[in-house]
Amino acid sequence: MCTRKYFLSKKATIVAGVDEVGCGSLVGAVVASAVLMLYPDQEQLFSGLIDSKALSNKKRLRFCNYIQKYSLHWSIGMVNVTEIDQLNIFQARLLSIKRAICNLSMIPDLVLIDGKHAPSLNKNILYQCFVKGDSRIPVISAASIIAKVTRDQAMMMLHTQYPKYGFHRNKGYATVFHLKQLDLYGPTIYHRKTFAPVKYMLSMC
């Protein structure tokens, strides 16, 4: 657990939490967010936050506005569909995290990353990975919320271009409805060609 003692041992005054969303989607970018906070503020301001996936859309948006207002800085890192297909989803995830960290306005004393793996970072950047960190560490929860809201908004915009696929609801994930529409109409240019259902569909053309 990421306790007060842990932060003090790292002499971490300014911390950043990082999380990403969209790895399992068939459509669109992988989006990561990094949120920069003073360590004491992380506990005081963000202690009630939970993983973005456990929140309603309304609460998630309200928390997102709150985080953007009270954090020292926040950033986004995106990896687009072309890059995902050129790399793989594992490397795309790491790249989105790296871009989010690099887009921060300053180097934190400590970066807290959700999951088991971290990208290669500047040697001056101290980091620690935490499995299920988005539900254990407030500043990572904050990052997960901003990443989720950012990606959901992008998928809503994509829905206006391609309304047949239900992106406003499924956010590009492989729901029964999405797969049915994919079978009827084929993939869009924003579908990930290397992902199994899309790859299979393209092989049938």
UniProtKB/Swiss-Prot annotation:
This is Ribonuclease HII. The keyword Nuclease applies. A divalent metal cation binds at D19, E20, D114. Residues 13-205 form the RNase H type-2 domain. Disulfide bonds: none annotated. The keyword Hydrolase applies. GO terms for cellular component: cytoplasm; ribonuclease H2 complex. It holds the Pfam family RNase_HII. Manganese or magnesium. Binds 1 divalent metal ion per monomer in the absence of substrate. May bind a second metal ion after substrate binding. It comes from Blochmanniella floridana. SUPFAM superfamilies: Ribonuclease H-like. Its cofactor is Mn(2+); Mg(2+). It is an enzyme of class 3 (hydrolase). It comes from the Bacteria.
